[in-house]
Protein backbone atom coordinates (compact mmCIF):
# COMPACT_ATOMS: atom_id res chain seq x y z
CA UNK A 1 0.00 0.00 0.00
CA UNK A 2 1.19 3.49 -0.81
CA UNK A 3 2.15 5.91 1.95
CA UNK A 4 -0.02 8.60 0.34
CA UNK A 5 -2.73 9.96 2.63
CA UNK A 6 -5.31 12.57 1.70
CA UNK A 7 -8.02 14.27 3.71
CA UNK A 8 -11.43 14.97 2.21
CA UNK A 9 -14.81 16.29 3.26
CA UNK A 10 -18.19 14.95 2.24
CA UNK A 11 -20.48 17.20 0.20
CA UNK A 12 -24.20 17.34 -0.42
CA UNK A 13 -24.34 19.82 -3.30
CA UNK A 14 -24.38 17.85 -6.54
CA UNK A 15 -24.32 18.68 -10.23
CA UNK A 16 -22.06 20.60 -12.59
CA UNK A 17 -22.93 23.97 -11.07
CA UNK A 18 -21.95 22.84 -7.58
CA UNK A 19 -18.70 21.36 -8.89
CA UNK A 20 -17.82 24.60 -10.69
CA UNK A 21 -18.42 26.59 -7.50
CA UNK A 22 -16.13 24.28 -5.56
CA UNK A 23 -13.35 24.69 -8.09
CA UNK A 24 -13.65 28.43 -8.71
CA UNK A 25 -14.65 29.82 -5.33
CA UNK A 26 -13.11 27.37 -2.86
CA UNK A 27 -10.15 25.89 -4.79
CA UNK A 28 -11.50 22.38 -4.20
CA UNK A 29 -11.50 19.23 -6.33
CA UNK A 30 -14.86 17.41 -6.48
CA UNK A 31 -14.64 13.63 -6.34
CA UNK A 32 -16.72 10.48 -5.89
CA UNK A 33 -15.94 7.28 -3.98
CA UNK A 34 -17.79 4.16 -5.09
CA UNK A 35 -17.56 0.39 -4.81
CA UNK A 36 -17.68 -2.13 -2.02
CA UNK A 37 -20.80 -2.58 0.05
CA UNK A 38 -21.29 1.14 0.65
CA UNK A 39 -23.20 3.68 -1.40
CA UNK A 40 -21.31 6.14 -3.61
CA UNK A 41 -20.12 9.17 -1.66
CA UNK A 42 -19.56 12.68 -3.03
CA UNK A 43 -16.52 14.38 -1.50
CA UNK A 44 -14.03 17.17 -2.19
CA UNK A 45 -10.30 17.69 -1.65
CA UNK A 46 -8.01 20.67 -1.35
CA UNK A 47 -6.78 21.32 -4.90
CA UNK A 48 -3.25 22.14 -3.72
CA UNK A 49 -2.95 18.86 -1.81
CA UNK A 50 -4.24 16.87 -4.77
CA UNK A 51 -1.71 18.49 -7.10
CA UNK A 52 1.09 17.61 -4.68
CA UNK A 53 -0.13 14.01 -4.33
CA UNK A 54 -0.30 13.58 -8.10
CA UNK A 55 3.43 14.30 -8.29
CA UNK A 56 3.94 10.92 -6.59
CA UNK A 57 4.08 8.09 -9.13
CA UNK A 58 2.52 5.53 -6.80
CA UNK A 59 -0.86 7.29 -6.61
CA UNK A 60 -1.67 6.06 -10.12
CA UNK A 61 -1.06 2.37 -9.41
CA UNK A 62 -1.37 1.76 -5.66
CA UNK A 63 -3.91 1.49 -2.89
CA UNK A 64 -3.84 4.57 -0.68
CA UNK A 65 -5.81 5.99 2.24
CA UNK A 66 -8.16 8.93 2.31
CA UNK A 67 -9.82 10.23 5.44
CA UNK A 68 -13.38 11.47 4.94
CA UNK A 69 -14.89 13.30 7.91
CA UNK A 70 -12.58 11.36 10.22
CA UNK A 71 -13.19 7.90 8.69
CA UNK A 72 -10.50 6.09 6.68
CA UNK A 73 -11.24 4.62 3.25
CA UNK A 74 -8.84 2.41 1.25
CA UNK A 75 -9.08 3.40 -2.41
CA UNK A 76 -7.47 3.31 -5.83
CA UNK A 77 -7.59 6.09 -8.38
CA UNK A 78 -9.90 5.03 -11.21
CA UNK A 79 -10.25 8.22 -13.25
CA UNK A 80 -8.76 11.69 -13.28
CA UNK A 81 -10.13 14.62 -15.27
CA UNK A 82 -7.77 17.51 -15.95
CA UNK A 83 -8.29 20.89 -17.59
CA UNK A 84 -7.14 20.68 -21.24
CA UNK A 85 -4.47 23.38 -20.87
CA UNK A 86 -4.51 24.76 -17.32
CA UNK A 87 -2.83 22.99 -14.36
CA UNK A 88 -6.22 22.25 -12.80
CA UNK A 89 -7.74 18.94 -11.70
CA UNK A 90 -11.46 18.99 -12.50
CA UNK A 91 -12.67 15.71 -10.98
CA UNK A 92 -11.53 12.41 -9.48
CA UNK A 93 -13.16 8.96 -9.34
CA UNK A 94 -12.01 6.70 -6.51
CA UNK A 95 -12.84 3.04 -5.95
CA UNK A 96 -13.07 1.46 -2.50
CA UNK A 97 -11.07 -1.73 -2.10
CA UNK A 98 -10.56 -4.35 0.57
CA UNK A 99 -7.34 -6.30 1.06
CA UNK A 100 -8.69 -9.40 -0.74
CA UNK A 101 -10.25 -7.65 -3.74
CA UNK A 102 -8.77 -8.80 -7.05
CA UNK A 103 -7.44 -5.83 -9.00
CA UNK A 104 -6.20 -5.43 -12.56
CA UNK A 105 -3.86 -2.46 -12.81
CA UNK A 106 -1.19 -0.96 -15.02
CA UNK A 107 1.96 -0.46 -12.95
CA UNK A 108 5.18 1.30 -14.01
CA UNK A 109 8.38 -0.56 -14.83
CA UNK A 110 11.58 0.72 -13.19
CA UNK A 111 14.90 -0.12 -14.87
CA UNK A 112 17.66 -0.29 -12.26
CA UNK A 113 21.47 -0.71 -12.44
CA UNK A 114 21.69 0.41 -16.06
CA UNK A 115 25.12 1.88 -15.36
CA UNK A 116 26.34 -1.68 -14.61
CA UNK A 117 24.99 -3.22 -17.82
CA UNK A 118 27.75 -4.83 -19.94
CA UNK A 119 25.85 -3.88 -23.08
CA UNK A 120 25.65 -0.22 -22.15
CA UNK A 121 29.31 -0.17 -21.08
CA UNK A 122 30.18 -1.48 -24.54
CA UNK A 123 28.40 1.45 -26.16
CA UNK A 124 25.03 -0.19 -26.75
CA UNK A 125 21.77 1.71 -27.04
CA UNK A 126 18.91 0.87 -24.66
CA UNK A 127 15.41 0.52 -26.08
CA UNK A 128 12.65 0.59 -23.45
CA UNK A 129 9.80 -1.10 -25.30
CA UNK A 130 7.51 -1.12 -22.25
CA UNK A 131 7.36 1.39 -19.42
CA UNK A 132 4.35 -0.21 -17.71
CA UNK A 133 2.78 -3.67 -17.51
CA UNK A 134 -0.71 -4.88 -16.64
CA UNK A 135 -0.93 -7.17 -13.62
CA UNK A 136 -3.58 -9.00 -11.59
CA UNK A 137 -3.40 -9.50 -7.82
CA UNK A 138 -5.17 -8.97 -4.53
CA UNK A 139 -5.22 -5.39 -3.30
CA UNK A 140 -2.91 -6.25 -0.41
CA UNK A 141 -0.26 -7.51 -2.88
CA UNK A 142 -0.44 -4.60 -5.35
CA UNK A 143 3.12 -3.33 -5.97
CA UNK A 144 3.91 0.31 -6.71
CA UNK A 145 6.16 -0.77 -9.60
CA UNK A 146 7.98 -3.72 -11.18
CA UNK A 147 11.78 -3.65 -11.25
CA UNK A 148 14.00 -4.84 -14.09
CA UNK A 149 17.63 -5.35 -13.06
CA UNK A 150 19.83 -4.34 -16.00
CA UNK A 151 23.17 -5.21 -14.36
CA UNK A 152 23.67 -8.39 -16.43
CA UNK A 153 21.97 -7.39 -19.68
CA UNK A 154 24.54 -7.52 -22.47
CA UNK A 155 24.78 -6.41 -26.08
CA UNK A 156 21.89 -7.75 -28.21
CA UNK A 157 20.16 -9.14 -25.12
CA UNK A 158 16.37 -8.83 -24.83
CA UNK A 159 14.36 -8.94 -21.60
CA UNK A 160 10.87 -10.35 -22.22
CA UNK A 161 7.73 -10.35 -20.09
CA UNK A 162 8.50 -13.91 -19.02
CA UNK A 163 11.82 -12.71 -17.57
CA UNK A 164 10.19 -10.28 -15.12
CA UNK A 165 10.56 -11.13 -11.44
CA UNK A 166 7.07 -10.53 -10.06
CA UNK A 167 6.31 -10.20 -6.34
CA UNK A 168 4.49 -13.03 -4.60
CA UNK A 169 0.81 -13.14 -5.49
CA UNK A 170 1.21 -11.00 -8.61
CA UNK A 171 0.53 -12.27 -12.14
CA UNK A 172 0.66 -10.77 -15.61
CA UNK A 173 -2.70 -10.49 -17.34
CA UNK A 174 -1.27 -12.04 -20.51
CA UNK A 175 -0.26 -15.68 -20.86
CA UNK A 176 3.43 -15.79 -21.77
CA UNK A 177 3.89 -19.55 -21.40
CA UNK A 178 3.45 -20.36 -25.09
CA UNK A 179 5.66 -17.51 -26.27
CA UNK A 180 3.08 -15.87 -28.54
CA UNK A 181 2.44 -13.03 -26.07
CA UNK A 182 5.92 -12.90 -24.57
CA UNK A 183 6.61 -9.33 -25.70
CA UNK A 184 9.98 -7.60 -25.25
CA UNK A 185 10.28 -5.15 -22.36
CA UNK A 186 13.78 -3.77 -22.90
CA UNK A 187 16.74 -4.54 -25.14
CA UNK A 188 20.27 -3.35 -25.86
CA UNK A 189 21.67 -3.10 -29.38
CA UNK A 190 24.78 -1.70 -30.99
CA UNK A 191 24.51 1.85 -32.28
CA UNK A 192 24.05 1.92 -36.06
CA UNK A 193 26.06 4.23 -38.29
CA UNK A 194 23.67 6.14 -40.53
CA UNK A 195 24.14 6.50 -44.29
CA UNK A 196 24.50 10.26 -43.76
CA UNK A 197 27.48 9.72 -41.47
CA UNK A 198 29.07 7.44 -44.04
CA UNK A 199 28.54 10.01 -46.79
CA UNK A 200 30.17 12.68 -44.64
CA UNK A 201 33.38 10.65 -44.17
CA UNK A 202 36.12 12.75 -45.86
CA UNK A 203 37.94 11.20 -48.79
CA UNK A 204 41.75 11.38 -49.01
CA UNK A 205 42.76 13.32 -52.16
CA UNK A 206 45.14 11.58 -54.57
CA UNK A 207 47.67 14.38 -54.14
CA UNK A 208 47.99 13.45 -50.48
CA UNK A 209 49.18 9.92 -51.30
CA UNK A 210 53.02 9.76 -51.50
CA UNK A 211 54.37 8.50 -54.81
CA UNK A 212 57.71 7.21 -56.15
CA UNK A 213 59.69 8.84 -58.90
CA UNK A 214 57.95 6.56 -61.40
CA UNK A 215 54.54 8.03 -60.39
CA UNK A 216 53.45 4.85 -58.63
CA UNK A 217 51.99 4.89 -55.19
CA UNK A 218 54.45 4.09 -52.42
CA UNK A 219 53.81 0.84 -50.60
Curated annotation (Swiss-Prot):
Belongs to the bacterial ribosomal protein bL25 family. CTC subfamily. Residues 193-219 are annotated as: Disordered. The gene is rplY. It comes from the Bacteria. Signal peptide: none annotated. Residues 209-219 have a biased composition (Polar residues). One of its GO terms (biological process) is translation. It comes from Legionella pneumophila (strain Corby). GO terms for molecular function: 5S rRNA binding; structural constituent of ribosome. This is one of the proteins that binds to the 5S RNA in the ribosome where it forms part of the central protuberance. PANTHER family: RIBOSOMAL PROTEIN L25/GLN-TRNA SYNTHETASE, ANTI-CODON-BINDING DOMAIN-CONTAINING PROTEIN, RIBOSOMAL PROTEIN L25_GLN-TRNA SYNTHETASE, ANTI-CODON-BINDING DOMAIN-CONTAINING PROTEIN. Part of the 50S ribosomal subunit; part of the 5S rRNA/L5/L18/L25 subcomplex. Contacts the 5S rRNA. Binds to the 5S rRNA independently of L5 and L18. The keyword NAD does not apply. This is Large ribosomal subunit protein bL25. GO terms for cellular component: cytosolic large ribosomal subunit. Pfam families: Ribosomal_L25p (PF01386), Ribosomal_TL5_C (PF14693). Keywords: Ribonucleoprotein, Ribosomal protein, RNA-binding, rRNA-binding.
Amino acid sequence: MSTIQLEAQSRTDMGKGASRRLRRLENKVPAVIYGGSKKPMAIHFSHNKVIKALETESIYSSVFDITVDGKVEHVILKALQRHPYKPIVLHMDLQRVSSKDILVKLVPVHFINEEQSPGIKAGGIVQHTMTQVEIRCQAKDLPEFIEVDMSKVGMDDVVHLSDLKLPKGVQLTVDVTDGSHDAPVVSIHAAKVSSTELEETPEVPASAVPTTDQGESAE
